[in-house]
Amino acid sequence: MEVIRSQKRTVSNDVVSTPTLPLYLTAPHMEVRLEEFELFAIDRLRVLKGVSDGLARARNPNEMDDLVETLWKEHMRLSNVSEMINKDIISHFVLRLVYCRSDELKKWFLSMETALFRHRFRLKKIEEQRAIVGEFGLPYKAVIGAELESLKERLGLVARSHGQISSDVENIYYKVPFEEVPDLVASRRVLLQKGFAFVAGTQLVSLVVTQFRSHLSKALILTNRKWTTTIREREKDRLTPIVEALSTSYLGPDYSQSNEYADISLKDIDQVSKSSFPLCMRHLFEKLREDHHLKHGGRMQLGLFLKGVGLKLDDALAFWREEFTKKVGSERFDKEYAYAIRHNYGKEGKRTDYTPYACSKIITSAPGAGDHHGCPYRHFSEDNLKAALSRMGLSSRGMEDVMDKVRNRHYQLACTLTFEAVYGTSCDTGINHPNQYFEESQKILKSKTPAAPV
């Protein structure tokens, strides 16, 4: 796959003729425009993050099928089938580059791509599923004749024990080494005999997913080797910055400018901090009021958040000045801190209009001693987090639900559950940005406020 700047993409016949559920066994022979390299990857990343959220919410297989179908239509579907397949393949291989770079990234990508493949496979008709099995070149053949007859009674018992009316709709079974289908063995959904599992045609997904995961796991190791030895340095001025940014990309709305739900003033800020700030910003705000100081990381995280919720530059300068001058003089504040505040608002230096930090950036930050920035769900001790959640009014049950997600490293979902517990309403999109939390909170609170009489 060769990335070019902006000319027409040429595609090999092999790519166009790929089945509608590619196996990604080999990289495609095609030229890809630089814009598509990034945009296709972002669209696929939206799908994978949706899958991650669905799994974290413990949705059942049928619900996950529906979710995957919806996510795919929303982010990956194109009117031209061959172009859609190309987008599928390109985006997968781009994200291989993005997520091969550390064990943590590889683990996440491997799990999400495997889950995505599983549910896309489940959505295919049985004939298409068998064709995909053939594409893998698996050596397993259907059990027929006397061997099948001798097993029919026991196969029927296994099937009926899981609610099937007959042993199998198609009466087709595959004889495979039991270690190839660990999930079916663990759930006792297959007949075992002499080291083999007899897998029904309707259970092909388990067999294929094992192969898919094994292949992708090995491929990520090879991709990492190529990335570190050649690609990263060779593409340092072109692809490398895109690849390194994608794994922490925020994919939601732009909160750099305030909107109808984001317009606060100094007189409201203390009350609003208690009613609508997410825990990360509430903690920073309280530490600032308590200590009259925050280190650089905390000032950036809170300052840009306040900018995004509508605090004007003059009010921001007055807010920070009021706190900091309780410990340092006005002259020192103007010299050491005021410039940085104006800089964040695009009034100094390169005049860049800086955007508030998204959850992905906050979670991956590394606060040190004396720092208060970062994500409380990741960086707080369990006792400190429980105390903070208690101050937000969470019940014991709600707190335990949140802590369960924290222990499983689903930090954004933990924040989402906190939001749902505080406001008594669901947040199906999940919390991906502190300013999103604030905006959704304000919508709820303002909807409950009686309209002023005319």
From Swiss-Prot:
It comes from the Eukaryota. GO terms for cellular component: alpha DNA polymerase:primase complex. GO terms for biological process: DNA replication, synthesis of primer. Binds 1 [4Fe-4S] cluster. The keyword S-adenosyl-L-methionine does not apply. Its cofactor is [4Fe-4S] cluster. One of its GO terms (molecular function) is 4 iron, 4 sulfur cluster binding. Keywords: 4Fe-4S, DNA replication, DNA-binding, Iron, Iron-sulfur, Metal-binding, Primosome. The keyword Acyltransferase does not apply. InterPro entries: DNA_primase_lsu_euk (IPR016558), DNA_primase_lsu_euk/arc (IPR007238). [4Fe-4S] cluster binds at residues 280, 359, 375, 415. Heterodimer of a small subunit and a large subunit. Belongs to the eukaryotic-type primase large subunit family. DNA primase is the polymerase that synthesizes small RNA primers for the Okazaki fragments made during discontinuous DNA replication. This is Probable DNA primase large subunit. It comes from Arabidopsis thaliana (Mouse-ear cress). The lineage of its organism: Eukaryota, Viridiplantae, Streptophyta, Embryophyta, Tracheophyta.
